[in-house]
Amino acid sequence: MCQYSATNGLVNDWHIVHYGTRAVGGVGLLMLEATAVAPEGRITRFDLGLWDDNQIAGLEKITRFAHEQGATTAIQIAHAGRKASHDSPANGGKQLSIAEGGWQTVAPSAIPFDSTEIPPHELNEVEIEHIVDQFTATALRAKQARFDVLEIHAAHGYLIHQFLSPLSNKRTDEYGGSFENRKRLLLKIVTAVKTVWPQELPLFVRLSATDWTEGGWSLEETVKLSDILYQQGVDMIDCSSGGNISTAKIPLSPGYQVHFSEEIKKTGVLTAAVGLITTVEQMNSILAEGKADMIFLGRELLRNPYFPIVSTLGTDREIEWPIQYLRGK
C-alpha cells in the first residue's frame, strides 16, 4: 500500500524499514506500492517512482534485503492519470492546482474524477504512445532493481482503468468507444513491457473487476479481458474493484471481492484475491474452495507486519523464524 513518504520518487529509510519488516515477518511475496512511471503520473508528490535510473539503487536495497529473508519481490508500476496531483492523505488528500504545487493531470477524456477537481488534459495519440514507452522503460528498471515479479496497475481509477471504463473514456478514436478500443492501451502496454521483462519472470495485472456503477466497467468485461491477457502471457490477475467513480456505492464486507477472483479464475488464468481478508481461516477457505490461487494482504500487514510468522506458529506449516527473533516464539 502507498506510503506517501518519498521525495522525488526516491526510496528512503522509511521504505527500507517498512518493506524490510514485512519480509522479516514472513510474507511469501513482498509487493511494493504503486510506483510511478512518470513524475506527472504520481498520485501525490510523495509517491515512489521508477521513471529515472537514479531511483533504481534505492529499490535494489529493498529487493536485496527481502531476498536475504527468503521473500520474493514484486513491484506495481502505475500512472495515476486524472487521479494525480493530490496532497497526501495525511494532509487531506485534496487535488492540488499548479499554483499549490500540483501539475496538469492527463486522462483519456477531459472528465475530472470529481466535480470539484480540475479537468484533466485529454491525451492525444502521440502522448499515449509516450506513456506506453514510459511503462516499458520502468519495467526495464524494475528488472535492473532485481524484482522477481512485475505488476501493471490497471485498477482503482488510475490511467489504464480510466481508458477501460466507458464512464471516464468518451474518446471517438481507436482508444475509445468499443470494448476492443478501450482495452487497446492496456494491451499495448503489456505487449511492450514483455519485450523487456524476462519471459521466465511472472507478469501480473491488477484490474478493478467493476466500477460499482451502472454503465461502467463490468465484471463481464473484466472476465473477457482477463482471458485475452492470459492468452497474451499475463501470469496472474490481481482482482480488486472500484476507484474510478467518486459516487460509487461499494458494499464493503469481509472478502467482498473474492467473487470476482472466482469468476475470473474460470478463464484459466491464476488469480489473487484481495480486500477485507483478515484471518487465516478466511484465507484457507478461499484457497481450499478454489476461489483464488493467492491471497494479497494490505491493511492487515499495516496492523501486524509479522502476521505470517505469528499466524503459523504451532501449526504444521510454521514459517521459519529469523534467528534474531527466536526468543520471541
What are these regions (language model features)?
Residues 1-329:
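Flavin-dependent oxidoreductase catalytic cores
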